[in-house]
Amino acid sequence: MDYPDRVVLGENEVNFKKPIIGVVCDVIKNGANSFHGAGEKYINAIAHGANAIPILIPAKTAGEDLKSLSDFFDADFFGQLDGVFFPGSPSNVEPHHYGNEKSATPDSHDRQRDGSSLPLIKLAIEKGIPLLAACRGMQELNVAMGGELYQQLYNHEQFIEHRENKEADRKGQYQLAHEVSLTANGLLANILGQNSHQVNSLHGQGIKTLGQGLTVEAYAPDGLIEAISCIDESSFAIGVQWHPEWNFSQDKLSTALFKAFGDEVYKRFMQK
């Protein structure tokens, strides 16, 4: 959607700005230092695919010696956003959030991101803030709504290999890996206008049981859930297991997905 530079109301000319989408950060460790950030590919997809202004949302705590961000990043402030994006990440959600006591990958977690993402997903759905989630983000959406994850898909014989080739270059890792079947008359199928599409695959975990209030939007050939959405039509909340931000402008489904997200964000922006 193209936005005008200004709007004329009667005799008054009002400056017109783009909607704002919050992007949840990872905590990246570099020696003794910690940084809060999100990949450039996600920022570009929000800015150019959804046609919105991306702002970064730091993780819940910025270190044990500092205050929790919840002291000033509260529900009222979050409610001023026009949309929120939960990107992929090398980290995994800590399994105690979905009822598993032991982690199969104890060195792969980002506790601070868990502390931001899980409550913010619930808040976004409660306030009707449009939400898009990719890879880990989709898993967070499922866990936030009470669902469970497979911790290691590759240890279950019924699943194909969903991880990327670690020996390949970056382009090779993000190449199309398998087809997904979109649920007939589902949100994703309606956005794309077809019932299947090829996607990339770079994940070792996946949805085991579906969270409450969610519905399946796509399956992999092995039956693994690849996309979900909120049943409540008043809340645009969709998660995909693949990485739609990669070459988003060249992939039909990715282009359509970010445009649909941007359109919903714009509707909220105009209602303020």
Segments from the language model and where they lie:
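Active-site-proximal beta-strand elements of phosphoester/diester hydrolases
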Residues: 238-241
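The feature captures the ABC ATPase H-loop/switch
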Residues: 138
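Conserved G/P- and acidic residue-centered "switch" motifs that form tight phosphate/ATP-binding loops
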Residues: 135
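N-terminal beta1-alpha1 cap of cysteine-dependent amidohydrolase-like domains
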Residues: 1-132, 143-147, 154-192, 198, ...
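A short, structured beta-strand/loop element
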Residues: 234-236
